[in-house]
Amino acid sequence: MAAITAAMVKELRERTGLGMMECKKALVEAEGNVETAIEELRKSSGLKAAKKAGRTAAEGVSLVKVSDDNTVAFILEVNSETDFVARDDNFMNFANDVLNVAFEKGETDVAKLMEGDLEAKREALVQKIGENITVRRIIKVEGPVVGGYVHSNNKIASVVALTAGNEELARDIAMHVAAVNPRVGKPDDMPAEELEKEKEIIKAQPDMEGKPAEIVEKMMGGRIKKFLAENSLVEQPFVKNPDQKVGDLIKSAGGDLVGFIRLEVGEGIEKEEVDFAAEVAAAAGTGKA
């Protein structure tokens, strides 16, 4: 039996787009012959998974797992092509499997995490449901007190870390993060480039035109302060009690904000615009050249 080398597996993966375990299995069956392995994969359903990989997966779920002592949380996003599949039990079971393994191993590197059993499960799921499935990102959050929240549709998940307080408080603030979507934790965290961009927008507003420089400067200061208050978590009115700022709520528990993470399914992914008439025509072999 021919020895299967890492280079052979790498070549087959690059040429087919299939997972490591499936490529290795194909090479073993082909006794190390890459071309034979490719031919056999083309005959089997194995290559179907690779073909699906070219399609945009912009639906899916965001999930959270928090440790029993509320000091560590893992938050992840797993994508599918359609919302219908995202609500399928098989898809949800896979997403939870990935989350649990990531949590147990303490792993946030998706490529490393997906080596072995999880990649085999992903490929099997692609075969079963006929859609591209991707594990997009996994983030670990640590702190003295950590709380997580997942919106009822599993599309938005968030985690908050505090220096003090309890799990219920951290979870409530995570719920606020999910609902309000602050840009930063505190005003000082706002990136300089975003501040400059906002200043340019304010300067261009009609009521700034023709005013003395000192008046413009004063108006600018007030509007920037408002911008920072609206977009900084600690300055926002708490969603469950708008009379209290989130920062004051945290302080009342003797704590401070360490940080937060909010994941929304599909954010930053450019969805494909599908021309269904053209797709049907192409499938029927009637598409025009």
Swiss-Prot record:
Please list where the region (Involved in Mg(2+) ion dislocation from EF-Tu) is annotated: 82-85
Please give the family membership noted in the entry: Belongs to the EF-Ts family.
What name does UniProt use for this protein? Elongation factor Ts
**GO CC annotation: what is one?**
cytoplasm
- Outline what the protein does: Associates with the EF-Tu.GDP complex and induces the exchange of GDP to GTP. It remains bound to the aminoacyl-tRNA.EF-Tu.GTP complex up to the GTP hydrolysis stage on the ribosome.
Q: Which UniProt keywords apply?
A: Cytoplasm, Elongation factor, Protein biosynthesis
GO MF annotation list: translation elongation factor activity
Query: InterPro entries from the xrefs?
Result: EF-Ts_dimer_sf, Transl_elong_EFTs/EF1B, Transl_elong_EFTs/EF1B_dimer, Transl_elong_Ts_CS, UBA-like_sf
Looking up Pfam families in the UniProt record yields: EF_TS (PF00889)
Task: Kindly list the places in or outside the cell where this protein is found, as annotated in its UniProt entry.
Answer: Cytoplasm
| Higher taxonomy | Bacteria, Pseudomonadati, Pseudomonadota, Gammaproteobacteria, Pseudomonadales
Mainly resides where?
A: cytoplasm
